[in-house]
Amino acid sequence: MAVNAKNWQELKKPNALEKKASGNGKCKATFVAEPLERGFGLTLGNALRRVLLSSLQGAAITAIKIENVLHEFSSLNGVREDVTDIVLNIKQVAIKMQGDGSRRLHISRTGPGVVTAGDIAVSGDIEVMNPELVICHLDQGAVFNAELTVDTGKGYVAAVANRPADAPIGLIPVDALYSPVRQVAYKVENARVGQELDYDKLLLTIETDGTISPEDAIAYSARILQDQLQLFVHFDDGLAPPTSAIGQSSLPSSSSEAENSANQLNRNLLKKVDELELSVRSANCLKNDNIIYIGDLVQKTEAEMLRTPNFGRKSLNEIKEVLSGMGLRLGMEIPGWPPENIEEMAKKLEQEY
């Protein structure tokens, strides 16, 4: 099949993704992408918004069991809120959990005082992101003991689906909002390219619950779309050809052109990042992050690079431009990297040049 690369190469693409912090910079940010072809602002904005709200993984409380409470329409002596209000408050607890599977957390407080999310006893791989959240108020002598069930998932799961078949008496299932993204809004404005205004500018505002940064949220959503759309591409566009292992092409050996392209790709991976002629700032950031070979670099995602100390968008764009000139990009998957004899292979490559 003759591939007409002009179908995508001649479309206007954003030069960079600009971030504008708004409100709480850790949880809320606006991203600006321009210029885009007319109509692409709406297409990308709507697709990203839907994925952000529905498909990102997170953790949430799925059930609660309170001592001396049989059902959610009960009340507790010395507790100002009834159980229904307590459950509503607990649903707002933002939990960050590293592992998978269901966990049990506990709260134990004696009045007088305020029970907050910070009173939840957590293990090392679990963190409560909004410890100041008020759960209930206790009067003098009141006792509040509760067990919380935490699980991981995506999207929204109704309380009825969180009730196990062997649920004990007193277990109250809770609506679980696993999504770490709380709000997404986008708008499309006109963008100027030269004297032309017939282009789109996409402004995407993302607010999270603090368990994930807005940058990571948009990166994950874009990766999900990329993964879903890959099925529809039935041809090789001539960019970095896939490799089954370092030094081995997964394309048919009958094509000498494909073999040469794959060999050149693998040669580039074995080069050291010092050979990229980057700015001093970018080079130092890579050195401090222990990135030695180009093969190490291309496996990093943009989000991972931006988490590197002193590494900003300017350095990111510089590296992306250099890698693009070599037919490489960030976020590549390279099976078998690093090879066991990487130093020997790199030394042999240097001798050839």
Swiss-Prot record:
Enzyme class at the top of the EC tree: transferase
Compositionally biased tracts (Low complexity): 248-263
Molecular-function GO terms, alphabetical: DNA binding; DNA-directed RNA polymerase activity; protein dimerization activity
Subunit composition and interactions: Homodimer. The RNAP catalytic core consists of 2 alpha, 1 beta, 1 beta' and 1 omega subunit. When a sigma factor is associated with the core the holoenzyme is formed, which can initiate transcription.
InterPro entries xref list: DNA-dir_RNA_pol_insert (IPR011262), DNA-dir_RNA_pol_RpoA/D/Rpb3 (IPR011263), DNA-dir_RpoA (IPR011773), RBP11-like (IPR036603), RNAP_asu_C (IPR011260), RNApol_insert_sf (IPR036643)
Catalytic activity: RNA(n) + a ribonucleoside 5'-triphosphate = RNA(n+1) + diphosphate
GO cellular component term, pick one: cytoplasm
Family, as annotated: Belongs to the RNA polymerase alpha chain family.
Function: DNA-dependent RNA polymerase catalyzes the transcription of DNA into RNA using the four ribonucleoside triphosphates as substrates.
Domain notes: The N-terminal domain is essential for RNAP assembly and basal transcription, whereas the C-terminal domain is involved in interaction with transcriptional regulators and with upstream promoter elements.
Region (Alpha C-terminal domain (alpha-CTD)): 260-353
Phylogenetic lineage: Bacteria, Pseudomonadati, Pseudomonadota, Alphaproteobacteria, Sphingomonadales
Region (Disordered): 244-263
Protein name (record): DNA-directed RNA polymerase subunit alpha
Keywords: DNA-directed RNA polymerase, Nucleotidyltransferase, Transcription, Transferase
HAMAP family: RNApol_bact_RpoA
Keyword Transferase attributed: yes
EC number of the protein: 2.7.7.6
Biological process according to GO: DNA-templated transcription
Record Pfam families: RNA_pol_A_bac, RNA_pol_A_CTD, RNA_pol_L
Region (Alpha N-terminal domain (alpha-NTD)): 1-236
